[in-house]
Swiss-Prot record:
Record key words, sorted: Host cytoplasm, Host cytoskeleton, Host-virus interaction, Inhibition of host innate immune response by virus, Inhibition of host IRF3 by virus, Inhibition of host IRF7 by virus, Inhibition of host RLR pathway by virus, Interferon antiviral system evasion, Metal-binding, RNA-binding, Viral immunoevasion
Domain description: The integrity of the zinc-binding domain in NSP1 is important for degradation of host IRF3.
Region (Interaction with host IRF3): 318-492
Oligomer and partners: Interacts (via C-terminus) with host IRF3; this interaction leads to IRF3 degradation. Interacts with host IRF7; this interaction leads to IRF7 degradation. Interacts with host CUL1 and CUL3.
Protein name in UniProt: Non-structural protein 1
Length: 492
């Protein structure tokens, strides 16, 4: 196990470029940090161990030793992890870059074997080739990769990943790209490598190669908001900001293939980029569809539908002395925009329900209450219109000119009054609402702070370093809600 880690340790003194590229945290003397009990492959040292969350992308893909280096596969610095990273589509040319890099960094020839023989201190006969002391020579070249699927963007991180484990909680899946390259051609590459090995090690090398290179690919899995850590979220004025660290290179390459061409033919440029790179910290907003869905689900879980039957004059989030309507504690760590939306939505539904139903106290048990929760849970799904129509039909609508309408005459506060006028684009509010008007008002209240169609599905910490730098220069990393404000707010 951990053949790739051992190879990085022993091969790091071979050449100058190896000394810079093969320094990984798993071979350092640093004290390990606390793990998060997620077992998987560290994509930097390739060992199967307990993982922690990366400081660059907030995903669990790095071990408790390598996390000290603060390296991420999304960095622009050409360290070893970056050199093993390619974006889809994967072509034969890109796979050839991976093979050439392995052959350059981890060569197997007579000089290398003799060098390791001199360094090995065996308890038994020095001429005995034991896998315990020569594990670094048993590193075959395979085309297995850990694959991250960020919606339509797919990122491959190639490495020699040994062992098996359940992948249910991992943000990536293992894929074998041998058929994209050529199965027989890759076999030939490895047969040439193992031909220089002593016969005792050749069998072990072949066993490792065929075991890993013939593994089937897993089905890709989307990365979800639940895969990201909340440890690097900070709350300022009840808005959340995510801290991310990236290693930024002063030298840029347009494509991954250009980077590998310099690795093969212009090593000085790679060394310059490694020594001049700097770590940069970004504060990025955490407004994304995944987080909004999570907040909406939590809001639906904690909401008190009894408020729509009450006579409370306070906003729904401010009621504290009522056992049926008190939800104040749920907003302690929630975005203030969610609280504002909750207050307006509950106030509007209360006004509609009190205008059409004969209820007078929040202790009343009404059949409409579960549907109010569904409004929050379905607010970001395609079922929202169907849910709102069901809610509308539970408010005792009447038929006028073959159209269902409900009365709308209960008191509302001034801010909600102005907001509804803006949504309906009218000078005076109607005293009767049709189903499409009811739906438009509710969806307008829900979408008042951000347009769901324009919000990214995942946090922007998964964007490339070049994209983060461009957004930083344009001021688009700010947590201010104006950056994601909906189009309807500009119509007033």
């Amino acid at each position: 196990m951990a053949t790739f880690k051992d190879a990085c340790f022993h091969y790091r003194k071979i050449t100058k470029i190896n000394r810079e590229l093969l320094k990984i945290g798993a071979n350092s003397i640093w004290t390990p940090v606390r793990s998060d009990k997620i077992k998987g492959w560290c994509i930097e040292c390739c060992q199967l161990t307990e993982l922690v969350f990366c400081s660059g992308c907030s995903l669990a893909h790095v071990c408790q030793w390598c996390v000290r280096n603060k390296r991420c596969f999304l960095d622009s610095q050409p360290h070893l992890l970056k050199l093993r990273t390619f974006e889809a589509p994967i072509t034969k040319e890109k796979l050839q870059c991976v093979i050439s890099m392995y052959n350059m960094l981890f060569p197997i020839n007579e000089n290398i074997i003799n060098r390791f023989k001199k360094n090995v201190k065996q308890k038994k006969c020095r001429n005995e080739f034991n896998a315990t002391w020569y594990n670094q020579l048993l590193l075959p070249i395979t085309l297995n990769a850990a694959v991250f699927k960020f919606q339509s963007r797919i990122v491959y991180v190639f490495g020699f990943y040994e062992g098996t484990t359940a992948c249910g909680y991992l943000p990536y899946r293992m894929v074998n790209c041998i058929d994209i390259y050529d199965r027989l051609l890759l076999d030939s590459v490895n047969f040439d490598r193992m031909s220089a090995l002593p016969s005792d090690l050749q069998a072990l090398y072949a066993q490792k190669y065929f075991k890993i290179s013939r593994l089937p690919s897993m089905k890709l899995r989307q990365v979800y908001y639940s895969d990201f850590t909340k440890q690097n979220l900070i709350t300022k004025y009840r808005t959340k900001t995510r801290i991310t660290h990236r290693n930024v290179s002063k030298i840029n390459w347009d494509t991954d293939i250009e980077l590998h061409n310099d690795l093969m033919h212009n090593k000085h440029r790679i060394l310059t980029a490694l020594t001049t790179a700097e770590e940069k910290q970004f504060e990025v907003h955490d407004v994304n569809l995944g987080r909004i869905k999570a907040d909406m689900f939590e809001l639906g879980h904690h909401c008190k539908p009894n408020y729509i039957s009450s006579n409370h004059w306070q906003p729904a989030s401010r009621v504290s002395l009522c056992r049926w309507c008190n939800i104040k504690y749920a907003f302690r760590n929630m975005d203030w925009r969610m609280e504002s939306m909750y207050n307006e939505l509950m106030s509007f539904i209360q006004s509609c329900y009190k205008s059409n139903a004969n209820v007078d106290h929040c202790s009343s048990i009404e059949s409409v209450y579960p549907m109010v929760r569904n409004v929050f849970w379905h607010s970001t799904t395609k079922y929202i219109d169907e849910t709102l129509e069901k809610l509308f039909n539970m408010m005792n609508p009447v038929n006028i000119d073959n159209q269902k309408v409900i009365s709308f005459h209960w008191q509302i506060d001034l801010s909600l009054y102005l907001h509804i006028k803006m949504i309906l684009k009218t000078e005076a509010l109607p005293f009767m609402l049709k189903v499409h008007e009811f739906q438009s008002i509710v969806k307008g209240i829900i979408n008042q702070w951000c347009d769901f169609s324009k919000v990214s599905e995942l946090p922007i910490c998964v964007e490339s370093t070049d994209t983060l730098l461009r957004m930083y220069e344009q001021g688009e990393l700010s947590e201010e809600y104006e950056l994601l404000i909906s189009d309807s707010d500009g119509d007033e």
